[in-house]
From Swiss-Prot:
GO cellular component terms, A-Z: cytoplasm
Disulfide bonds: none
Cited Gene3D superfamilies: Uracil-DNA glycosylase-like domain (3.40.470.10)
InterPro entries attached to this UniProt entry: UDG_fam1 (IPR002043), Ura-DNA_Glyclase_AS (IPR018085), Uracil-DNA_glycosylase-like (IPR005122), Uracil-DNA_glycosylase-like_sf (IPR036895)
Reactions accelerated catalytically: Hydrolyzes single-stranded DNA or mismatched double-stranded DNA and polynucleotides, releasing free uracil
Protein name: Uracil-DNA glycosylase
Primary enzyme class: hydrolase
Similarity comment: Belongs to the uracil-DNA glycosylase (UDG) superfamily. UNG family.
Any GO BP annotation: base-excision repair, AP site formation via deaminated base removal
Localization (cell): Cytoplasm
Gene this protein is translated from: ung
This enzyme's EC code(s): 3.2.2.27
Main location: cytoplasm
Record's keyword annotation contains DNA damage: yes
Length: 225
């Protein structure tokens, strides 16, 4: 499962692929993919990093592990492939976006448009066994994605980290550089969205920060497919 990242993440993350934890993760993944149905497809595991280069990252939206249903996960946190029903948390994200900007809720959950504008849609665990949430937790991915966060933390150019829920907020300890910005609330899940996600205005907060930095704002509107 070693991967040659074709953009500037390549040299930055190359040392990780040689570390003992990743070698063990690699053995585990080869076995998992050969015996079980695992998401996303092997070639899509690193999609978040492929779509959003290190230099171009403006925003990080941190997720947990991939969706574990058929045809959902494709390597971007919260995003699903075209033609698949929009999951409940993403639907709540769209509702908040509608309330902030008046955008119609789209007929899909395909967030590539965000990724292409510099929104790194990163899960902390990059693979999952079909139908078994968190089945690849604690196998090594957390070391790898912590390193991604640490590398962004080392950057002088500010990054806006969106941390929804306790799992994402646990990564705050990795964000020590005062150049960066943190936007946090409860998770958009139906279990918690009404306890402070709705009305938190994360999207306009991001764009206010970007505008103040002289950066191009994110066009958050997802088109119908």
């Amino acid at each position: 499962m070693k991967h040659v990242l074709k953009n500037d993440w390549g040299p930055l993350l190359a040392p990780e692929f040689e570390k003992e934890y990743y070698r063990e993760l690699d053995v585990f993944l080869k076995e998992e993919y050969s015996i079980h149905v695992v998401y996303p497809k092997v070639e899509e595991i690193f999609n978040a990093l492929e779509y959003t280069s290190y230099e171009n990252t403006k925003v990080v939206i941190l997720g947990q592990d991939p969706y574990h249903g058929p045809n959902q996960a494709h390597g971007l946190s919260f995003s699903v492939q075209p033609g698949v029903k929009t999951p409940p948390s993403l639907l709540n994200m769209y509702k908040e976006l509608r309330d902030e900007y008046g955008y119609d809720i789209p007929n899909n959950g395909y967030l590539v448009k965000w990724a292409e504008q510099g929104v790194l849609l990163l899960n902390t665990v990059l693979t999952v066994r079909q139908g078994e949430a968190n089945s690849h937790k604690g196998k090594g991915w957390e070391h790898f994605t912590d390193r991604v966060i640490e590398l962004l933390n080392e950057r002088e150019k500010p990054v806006i980290f969106i941390l929804w829920g306790r799992h994402a907020q646990a990564k705050k300890k990795l964000i020590t550089n005062s150049n960066h910005h943190i936007i946090e609330s409860v998770h958009p899940s139906p279990l918690s969205a009404r306890r402070g996600f709705f009305g938190s205005k994360p999207y306009s907060k991001v764009n206010t920060i970007l505008a103040n930095m002289g950066e191009r704002e994110i066009d958050w509107e997802i088109p119908n497919l």
